[in-house]
Amino acid sequence: MAAGLDFEATLSEEQTVLVVDIGGGTTDCSVLLMGPQWRDRADRQQSLLGHSGCRVGGNDLDIMLAFKQLMPLFGLGGETAKGIALPALPYWNAVATNDVPAQNDFYSAANGRVLRDLILDAAEPEKVKRLLKVYQQRLSYRLVRAAEESKIALSGQTAISAPLGFVQADLAESISQDQLADAISQPLMRIQEQV
């Protein structure tokens, strides 16, 4: 509701207003009566006509962008030397920074052994070595932050290069607005369902 109070100050008559507040981890939607007659009331319960919310927010968009656009540089979608697909779960857990069990699993000693075995089996071991570096240096949040910075930059540009030099010198990934839209389509649909 606080997200709509600035807007309410601009109203000269009562209106029914949909306030959508997309936070880091949640999206909240409220339908409110707003206007001069409501502005100074401490108790706004009577002006609240409806509310809904979901546990999807901006962080989920960043995580999906990191997973879909950055993780292929770390081996996601790759194969073993025998042509068997590499498991996707370690890649998801690496970027699922809003999921404590997933992060605990990614940073477990058992997963460290899995990653070392994947390097031995992978058709492109240099990519999986990057994932091992994420594991060893606990770089999950930096990866998701790089995705967030890319998302922000793409609001004003049609394509950007996401620098990942903290993983490997000169490592970067080109991301377009279309790729961003594709990557975040699933969590964005959940947000739109609230509206």
Where are these regions (language model features)?
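Alpha-helix capping and helix-loop boundary segments enriched in small/acidic/polar residues
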Residues: 14-20, 49-57, 171, 175, ...
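Adenine-nucleotide phosphate-binding core of ATP-dependent small-molecule kinases
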Residues: 132-140, 169-195
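Conserved A3 ("GATE") glycine/threonine-rich loop of ANL adenylate-forming enzymes
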Residues: 1-3, 25-26, 56-63
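Conserved phosphate-binding catalytic cores of ATP/NTP-utilizing and phosphoryl-transfer enzymes
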Residues: 1-20
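Phosphate-binding glycine-rich/basic clefts of nucleotide- and phosphate-handling proteins
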Residues: 33-168
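Short flexible coil/turn linkers enriched for glycine and charged/polar residues
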Residues: 11-12, 22-26, 141, 156-158
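Well-ordered alpha-helical segments embedded in enzymatic catalytic cores
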Residues: 2-3, 146, 190, 194
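Short beta-strand scaffold segments in enzyme catalytic cores
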Residues: 28-32
